[in-house]
Each structure stands twice: as structure tokens, then as C-alpha cells.
Amino acid sequence: MSKFYLISPLILQKCLWPFTWLFFGVICRWQVSGLENLKYLKTGKGIVFAVNHTSEMDPILVPAAFPFSSKYLPMFYTSRRKDFYSNSGWRQIFYGGFFFKIWGAHALNSGKRNYEISLQNHIELLKEGKSLCIFPEGKTTRDGNLMEGRGGTAYLADKLGCPIVPVYLGGLFKLSFKDLILRRRKLSVSFGEPLYRHDLFHKGEMRSASDYKAGTAVIMSAIADLKKRTF
């Protein structure tokens, strides 16, 4: 991965941070909780933030929840390949490809049926100590409820030993700009306690695809617990 795509997310996210913080923190109603759960995470080691996926605003809201000087910024992301967005109308100009990459979103090598190949770019980022935002459900919710997670998130914890921080985003589902401006919704970003390999798997066993799905189910359960405690 070129240095340009490692540096550009830091520049963009830092430049936009004052505006997103002002928008979400002052104009909108929002609440950030659980940052104290990250206090003892080691610096220089990759961290996965496992987030429920409710809207296109999710990748903007997550970095805005951190302080400007946070060691967890910039945030990198998993995304779909550019051709996935070919039926997205005018938005396909921006979705995928260059515009996603400069924000920190890199495509999964989907369809390979191999986690190491699918997550190749993201494994590299984590090995370099970056923060990775991943949406375990693999797509945005259609009814506002949490969906079943895919196994890739747990695979990263197993392969790299990196902590998985469950994150719940609330109030964004089917949120309109009018709702935002009129402050009809309260938005929330809730960070849970980190989960580790031993929280997701039994010690010493050989892993299968079903084991990774079961491990991700533990992560989704932690996100569900955060949802229950929100507001």
C-alpha cells in the first residue's frame, strides 16, 4: 500500500474533525460513551473497531467521536469494490476507488472464500498498528435491527491477536437531514470493553469457518448489549 493512502486519511479526517464535531456535537443531539474502555489499549498495536452498520454516515460519525488528538486516528475501513456501487446513481462517482481510499477505506477481495486473501489490505494495516473500522454485518441494516455477523472480524483477532472493540451507533437508521437539523433524533456512539482472542475461541483448537462465525457472534452480542444500555 502506498504511503499516500496511509497519510491522506490522517489529513482528511483531522481537517474535517472540527466540522463534524461541531455538526454532531452542537447542531445535532449526540452522546459519546465508553471511551474510558480504551484507556489501557496498547499503542502501536492494531485495533479493530467492530461497528453495527446503519447508514452511509457511519464512517464519518465514528472518527468524530474521538478527541482531535486521539491516538486512534486516523481510522481505516473495510469497503466493497467500486463495481459494487455501479447502480448507486450519482453516488457511484464517489463510492469505491480513489475517493474511498483517500478517506481510508480499502476494498475487500470478496468472493475468494479465504479470509487471508479477502482481508489482505486490512491485515497489512493492522500489522502497521493502524485502527480499523469494520462492519461485521457486511451491509447496512434494512430494518434497524442488528444482523448476523460474518467471520472475518473474529479471524483478525485470531490471526493477529489484536483487540476487538465493539461499537454501537444509535439513531442513524433512516435519519433524514431534516431530522438532524430539527434535532428530532439523539445520536449515540457507544464503545464497549475490548474483546480478545480468548474471549472468542476455545484455547488451542483448530479454527474452521463456523468457529470464526461463532466468534463474530460473540462480538455482535457485545454490540447488542451496548444497544440495550444506550439512552
How would you name each of these model-derived features?
Residues 2-4, 8, 113-231:
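Non-catalytic C-terminal accessory region of glycerolipid acyltransferases
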Residues 23-25, 70, 99-100, 125, ...:
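A generic structural signal for well-ordered alpha-helical segments
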Residues 41-112:
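Catalytic core of membrane glycerolipid acyltransferases/transacylases, capturing the structured
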Residues 23, 102-109, 136-139:
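Short, basic, glycine/proline-bearing loop/turn elements
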Residues 23-29, 108-113, 143-144:
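Short, flexible loop segments at the rims of nucleotide/cofactor-binding pockets, characterized by
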Residues 21-53:
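Helix-to-loop junction immediately C-terminal to a conserved catalytic motif
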Residues 3-29, 87-104, 179-186:
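Alpha-helical membrane-targeting segments
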Residues 32-35, 93, 116-119:
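Structural motif corresponding to alpha-helix initiation and N-cap regions
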